[in-house]
Amino acid sequence: GLVISNDFSPGRSALVSQTERRTNGFRRHFSTNENDFFRGAAATVNWKNLDINLFYSYRKLDGGVDSTIVTSFKTDGLHRLVRDREKMHKVSMQTYGGNVRYATPGLCIGLTALSYSFGNYSIQPDPKPYNLFYFRGNRNLNISVDYLLKNKLIKFYGETALSRNGAVASLNALQLTPASYFSLLLLYRYYDKRYQAFFG
């Protein structure tokens, strides 16, 4: 998705039927990856056609720290060398957010908000040509609206998101299925180069 979790939204696929958004809700972290997960508490409330999901996470990240400046994150999970151990669990990250979704068989609309901060640290990567538009600062906010309209022949779905700096990203798809053996998918992606989403 544009705000959170890459397996949460449309993506590229050889099969047209596999690009539609999947709403898996909260689930256990099974990967050996030490970075792409949350540690904390989550709750889901279902009422008629409305789902409300809220969560809070606090965890420590590995990173290169100079006083109160974080110049890089260490994401390989290895702590074999002294320099690796010096970066271990240096940066605290607090994340909270939620999603409210209204769903019927032909219509689904949701609102997602996510806020995260890095304690007393400021993220300031060393300036390089490839990271000119990376997130810099202590906190960020992402908000998105996702939508799905469908009937037997046509399906329109997508997500449009905004980051704290005002940059927009949007991912939309139109799927036409005139027959059970034939489907056509049009996918439109727009990402402002300034759009910043740590978990998107």
Predicted regions mapped to residue ranges:
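Outer-membrane beta-barrel channel domains
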Residues: 1-200
